[in-house]
Curated annotation (Swiss-Prot):
Keywords: Antibiotic, Antimicrobial, Defensin, Disulfide bond, Fungicide, Secreted. Disulfide bonds join 3-31, 5-20, 10-30. Pfam families: Defensin_1 (PF00323). It is found in: Secreted. This is Neutrophil defensin 4. Bactericidal activity, greater against Gram-positive bacteria. Low anti-fungi activity. It comes from the Eukaryota. Belongs to the alpha-defensin family. HANP-2 could be a product of proteolytic N-terminal amino acid removal from HANP-4. Coiled coil: none annotated. One of its GO terms (cellular component) is extracellular region. InterPro entries: Alpha-defensin_C (IPR006081). Its main location: secreted.
């Protein structure tokens, strides 16, 4: 499983499992099998 912090949304085929915070910006934690 590979996970990335992305914004504004996850790519198709990815599942959001949480959030990342980098500085004052929130990202979606997106994982793909």
């Amino acid at each position: 499983v590979t996970c990335f912090c992305k914004r504004p949304v996850c790519d198709s085929g990815e599942t959001q499992i949480g959030y990342c915070r980098l500085g004052n910006t929130f990202y979606r934690l997106c994982c793909r099998q």
